[in-house]
């Protein structure tokens, strides 16, 4: 297993061991991932790199409990996922409680303002509307877009919308943040700001951030980079 340097007594928030993912059967089978193993510790910001079709997004979706692995083991914050104890409802609860997702395109609901886009995640997890909105405004203030809390997504700049999307991802205080091309739609200045925010969040919340990216503008923001090619870790697994 390719391991990152362990600091103190920290244990991995994400431990993927021998993960394989296959689609289809027989002549139509596609091997999207083959025996991929990674570890990510609290406070670390890690990149998944590789050409299109290398398996980066598939691995992210397995870690995010969106896709089931065909083989291998996955531990998230100490929980062994996909063993016989886990029902689909358990996986949904795990995603709500422990995982935050950030995507290339923010996918904010166009008919809700910024604060209600964030508050909706909390309400789905069981919070009442008032406390959800209070938490949403706190997050927007923290990400320096509190002055846009009443704005619809169509009125936000690309950078502002992505910060709202980050606030939404952080609503339930996840320990694991998964980002799929989070800066691809941003210029170099805004991309740097978003990555600096993710680094700050990882440090302050003792969270793990895993990002799929092709964006060489932000490579210097990562603690470690895993390179994938044809569904396998390239070389020694990372740098």
Residue ranges of each PLM-predicted region?
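Conserved switch/coupling elements of ABC/ABC-like ATPase nucleotide-binding domains
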Residues: 80, 230-239
């Amino acid at each position: 297993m390719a391991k990152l340097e362990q600091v103190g007594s920290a244990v991995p928030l994400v431990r993927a061991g021998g993960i394989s993912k296959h689609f289809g059967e027989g002549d139509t089978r596609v091997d999207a991932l083959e025996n991929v193993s990674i570890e990510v510790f609290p406070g670390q910001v890690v990149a998944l790199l590789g050409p299109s079709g290398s398996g980066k997004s598939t691995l992210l979706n397995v870690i995010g409990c969106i896709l089931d692995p065909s083989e291998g083991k996955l531990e998230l914050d100490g929980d062994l996922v996909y063993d016989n104890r886990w029902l689909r409802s358990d996986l949904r609860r795990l995603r709500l409680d422990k995982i935050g997702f950030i995507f290339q395109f923010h996918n904010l609901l166009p008919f809700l303002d910024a604060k209600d886009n964030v508050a909706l995640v909390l309400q789905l997890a069981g919070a009442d509307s008032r406390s959800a909105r209070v938490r949403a405004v706190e997050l927007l203030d923290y990400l320096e877009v509190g002055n846009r809390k009443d704005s619809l997504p169509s009125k936000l700049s690309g950078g502002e919308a992505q910060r709202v999307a980050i606030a939404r991802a952080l609503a339930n205080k996840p320990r694991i943040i998964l980002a799929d091309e989070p800066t691809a739609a941003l210029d170099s200045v805004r991309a740097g700001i978003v990555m600096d925010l993710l680094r700050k969040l990882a440090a302050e919340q003792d969270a793990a951030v895993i990002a799929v990216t092709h964006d060489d503008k932000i490579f210097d923001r990562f603690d470690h980079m895993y390179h994938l090619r044809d569904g396998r870790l390239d070389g020694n697994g990372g740098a």
